[in-house]
């Protein structure tokens, strides 16, 4: 008979599966509480790293339609429920597993597809979403910047051919007539003060 506590736990795990775009199943045998806390901090706020009961997790996974963990729920199990950037979370997990051999990445899923441990490592090797977006923005911006440079080069070439002063020389040329106007006004003012 299911107790209210177990029913609540299954509902919470089911909800975690449904809200996550990815999850990674790990075995944490031998990790200290301090190490688990360090791992949770490195994963960030968009990833929930939860120690789970295997039987309850199997029920919750079935209810959520996640088949990636079939046959993998054995031993001390913890799951990283990833709601944000799956690449960054997978990278944090694999980096932590490299320095803490007690954490074993068993399997995972990403956007409904089951992943084995090597595929989780391959996901971690991808560039982060922010870096990918920055590259796309750079690619989109490059043609406009190149066009602006070409237009500016053509303008400079035309100015040289026509003998017009370059844009940098234009302000100096404009200042000269203003200085001449000031000189012509100064003698007129001097003459007016002499007459008085």
Curated annotation (Swiss-Prot):
Claim: Signal is one of the keywords in the record: no
Gene: rplJ
Biological processes annotated in GO: translation
Family, per entry: Belongs to the universal ribosomal protein uL10 family.
Region listing for Disordered, in residue ranges: 163-196
Keyword annotations from UniProtKB, A to Z: Ribonucleoprotein, Ribosomal protein, RNA-binding, rRNA-binding
Biased composition (Low complexity): 164-196
Database matches in PANTHER family: 39S RIBOSOMAL PROTEIN L10, MITOCHONDRIAL (PTHR11560)
Name this polypeptide is given: Large ribosomal subunit protein uL10
Gene3D superfamilies in the record: 3.30.70.1730
């Amino acid at each position: 008979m299911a107790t209210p506590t177990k029913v609540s736990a299954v509902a919470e795990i089911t909800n975690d599966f449904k809200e996550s775009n990815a999850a990674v199943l790990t075995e944490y045998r031998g990790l200290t509480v301090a190490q688990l806390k360090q791992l949770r901090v490195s994963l960030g706020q968009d990833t929930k790293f939860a120690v789970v009961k295997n039987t309850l997790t199997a029920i919750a996974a079935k209810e959520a339609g996640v088949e990636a963990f079939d046959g993998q729920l054995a031993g001390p199990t913890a799951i990283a429920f990833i709601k944000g950037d799956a690449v960054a979370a997978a990278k944090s997990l694999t980096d932590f597993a490299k320095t803490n051999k007690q954490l074993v990445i068993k399997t995972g899923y990403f956007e409904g597809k089951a992943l084995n441990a090597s595929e989780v490592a391959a996901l971690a090797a991808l560039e982060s979403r922010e870096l990918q977006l920055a590259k796309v923005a750079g690619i989109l911006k490059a043609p406009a910047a190149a066009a602006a440079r070409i237009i500016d080069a053509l303008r400079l070439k035309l100015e040289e051919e026509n003998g017009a002063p370059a844009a940098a020389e234009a302000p100096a040329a404009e200042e000269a007539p203003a200085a001449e106007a000031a000189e012509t006004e100064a003698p007129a003012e001097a003459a007016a003060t002499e007459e008085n």
